[in-house]
C-alpha cells in the first residue's frame, strides 16, 4: 500500500528542537531525523512494510532582508542569522534525500516589528510602557504564506488521483481537516503524527489514527515514567 508522508516544516523544527535541543541549529541532523522518522511510518505493527510514495517537506525560505531595529537603529542582516543559515542548509540537505520533495511557500513582505506575547500582555496590563522596551525584545513580524495551501492541495491531489492508500501528516493544528475529510471519503487511511504533542480537541473524529515515531521530549519521558505529575498527550496507535 503506497504511503505518502507530509511534514509541516515549521512545526517539525519546533518539535525537533524540543526533542534534541543540543542539535537546535544542526541542519544535517534535522534532515537526517526528518527522513528517518518519516520512513519509520512504513513499518506495520505486524512486521509488514509499506511502499513509500514520497516524503513532502513544506517550509518557507528564511528571512534574508536587512532591517533597522526601531529602538537601537542598528542595521541587522538577517541573511547571516543562525536561523537563516540553518533553514538554508536544511533545505539543501533535504534535496539530497531520496524520495523527498521540498515544497516552499514564501514570507510576507512586511517590514514591521513585533515582540513576545508576554511583553504584549505586560504592555496591555500597564505593567510596562513602550518606553521600557529594549532593542533585543523586538523581532521582525514575518508570517509564512502558501504552506497550508500547498499541504491541502497535495492531500487532495494524492487522494483524488488514487496515488496513495495512506497519508501520514506530521503537523499539530486543525488547518488540514477539510483536506483530511476529502481524503478519507476517497478511501485513504489518514494518520496524524503530532510528534508527541497534544492535538486539538475534537480532531480525532476527522482522522484514522495518531502515531508518533520520534522520541518523546525529555520532559515527557520523565512524566511517562511517573517522575513528573503532569499528563501526557494521548496517542492512538495507527496501523
What residues fall within each predicted segment?
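Domain-level signal for Mg2+-assisted phosphodiester chemistry and nucleotide/NA-binding surfaces
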Residues: 1-122, 135-136, 140, 189, ...
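Nuclease catalytic cores that cleave nucleic-acid phosphodiester bonds
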Residues: 104-239
Amino acid at each position: 500500500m503506497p504511503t505518502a508522508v507530509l511534514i509541516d516544516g515549521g512545526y517539525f523544527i519546533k518539535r525537533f528542537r524540543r526533542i534534541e535541543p543540543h542539535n537546535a541549529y544542526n541542519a544535517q541532523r534535522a534532515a537526517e531525523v526528518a527522513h528517518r522518522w518519516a520512513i519509520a511510518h512504513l513499518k506495520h505493527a505486524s512486521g509488514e512494510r509499506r511502499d513509500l510514495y514520497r516524503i513532502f517537506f513544506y517550509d518557507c525560505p528564511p528571512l534574508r532582508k536587512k532591517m533597522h531595529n526601531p529602538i537601537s537603529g542598528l542595521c541587522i542582516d538577517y541573511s547571516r542569522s543562525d536561523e537563516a543559515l540553518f533553514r538554508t542548509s536544511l533545505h539543501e540537505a533535504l534535496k539530497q534525500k531520496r524520495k523527498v520533495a521540498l515544497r516552499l511557500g514564501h514570507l510576507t513582505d512586511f517590514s514591521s516589528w513585533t515582540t513576545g506575547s508576554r511583553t504584549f500582555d505586560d504592555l496591555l496590563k500597564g505593567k510596562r510602557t513602550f518606553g521600557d522596551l529594549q532593542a533585543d525584545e523586538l523581532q521582525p513580524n514575518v508570517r509564512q504564506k502558501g504552506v497550508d495551501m500547498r499541504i491541502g492541495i497535495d492531500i487532495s491531489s494524492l487522494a483524488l488521483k488514487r496515488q496513495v492508500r495512506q497519508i501520514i501528516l506530521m503537523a499539530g493544528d486543525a488547518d488540514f481537516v477539510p483536506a483530511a475529510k476529502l481524503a478519507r471519503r476517497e478511501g485513504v487511511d489518514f494518520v496524524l503524527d503530532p510528534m508527541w504533542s497534544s492535538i486539538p480537541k475534537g480532531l480525532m473524529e476527522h482522522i484514522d489514527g495518531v502515531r508518533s515515531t520520534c522520541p518523546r521530549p525529555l520532559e515527557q519521558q520523565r512524566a511517562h515514567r511517573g517522575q513528573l505529575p503532569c499528563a501526557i498527550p494521548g496517542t492512538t496507535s495507527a496501523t
